[in-house]
Design a protein with these regions (language model features):
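N-terminal interaction modules that seed assembly of large macromolecular complexes
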Residues: 1-50
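Secondary-structure edge/capping motif, primarily at the C-terminal ends of alpha-helices
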Residues: 7, 18, 46, 71, ...
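Short, well-structured alpha-helical interface segments that form or flank functional binding sites
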Residues: 9-13, 31-34, 59, 82, ...
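Non-transmembrane, amphipathic alpha-helical segments
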Residues: 24-31, 45-56, 101, 105, ...
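Charge-rich, solvent-exposed alpha-helical interaction surfaces
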Residues: 35-38, 42, 63, 67, ...
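Charged low-complexity stretches with an acidic bias
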Residues: 45-66, 150-160
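A charged, amphipathic interaction segment
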Residues: 54-113
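Glycine-rich, aromatic-bearing surface loops/beta-hairpins
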Residues: 92-160
């Protein structure tokens, strides 16, 4: 959403600054561009052109948070729990630095990845400490994404 806002909802600009940077064949880049066009339409129709998130993004965070809590409660998901507790100090540190104590943990993780991508796009230097945190958060989110895929495919069994 912020990339769209930064490009003033201009698809030509989004193609130049975002889509063309993907190392993908032209047909995939065209799909990515179409996805951005659809996001622009959603942002306009939902009135979040200046700030805020479209409902789709809010729903994804809600679904991921629900899954996250179920995974933490499940005795079958010790690896997930360990990954979360390994990531937690970075989440706490990020919240303290950003003043985002009220944000859900997963939103803090996504904000960290977003901030990292923005720094990279701006060509700014990234400290080793930040890289360590981003690597751990990325690893944790990758595990959550895999569990989400399993859950959506009916393959995740969390009986307690």
């Amino acid at each position: 959403e912020d990339l769209i806002r930064a490009n003033n909802f201009d698809m030509d600009s989004i193609r130049r600054t975002v889509v063309d940077r993907y190392d993908q064949p032209d047909d995939i880049k065209e799909e990515i561009a179409k996805w951005y066009e659809e996001l622009i339409e959603m942002m306009r129709s939902e009135g979040v052109m200046e700030k805020g998130h479209i409902q789709l993004n809010k729903n994804v965070i809600i679904a991921l948070t629900d899954l996250h809590l179920r995974l933490l409660k499940s005795p079958k998901e010790m690896v997930y729990g360990a990954a979360y507790y390994k990531t937690l100090p970075f989440i706490v540190q990020l919240r303290a630095k950003s003043g985002g104590e009220d944000l859900p943990e997963l939103e803090t993780c996504f904000n960290a990845i977003y901030g990292f991508l923005m720094l990279k796009m701006q060509g700014k230097e990234i400290s080793p400490e930040t890289m360590e945190g981003i690597k751990q958060i990325s690893s944790f989110l990758a595990l959550l994404a895999e569990k989400y895929r399993e859950d959506m495919n009916g393959e995740l069994k969390l009986e307690e």
